[in-house]
């Protein structure tokens, strides 16, 4: 179970960072990155 939680959190952080890069390159303006 601990491995599942660790994998889920890792996937969440990875997808979140990818979203930050995509939103930053789109020049959305709502997020200042």
Swiss-Prot record:
InterPro entries: Cytochr_b6-f_cplx_su8_sf (IPR036143), Cytochrome_b6-f_cplx_su8 (IPR005497). It is found in: Cellular thylakoid membrane. It is a single-pass membrane protein. Disulfide bonds: none annotated. The chain crosses the membrane at residues 2-22. Coiled coil: none annotated. GO terms for molecular function: electron transporter, transferring electrons within cytochrome b6/f complex of photosystem II activity. Pfam families: PetN. One of its GO terms (cellular component) is plasma membrane-derived thylakoid membrane. Keywords: Electron transport, Membrane, Photosynthesis, Thylakoid, Transmembrane, Transmembrane helix, Transport. One of its GO terms (biological process) is cytochrome complex assembly. NCBIfam families: PRK02529.1. The 4 large subunits of the cytochrome b6-f complex are cytochrome b6, subunit IV (17 kDa polypeptide, PetD), cytochrome f and the Rieske protein, while the 4 small subunits are PetG, PetL, PetM and PetN. The complex functions as a dimer. Belongs to the PetN family. Component of the cytochrome b6-f complex, which mediates electron transfer between photosystem II (PSII) and photosystem I (PSI), cyclic electron flow around PSI, and state transitions. This is Cytochrome b6-f complex subunit 8. It comes from Synechococcus sp. (strain CC9311).
């Amino acid at each position: 179970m601990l491995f599942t939680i660790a994998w889920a959190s890792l996937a969440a952080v990875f997808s979140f960072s990818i979203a930050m890069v995509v939103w930053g390159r789109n020049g959305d303006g709502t997020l200042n990155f």
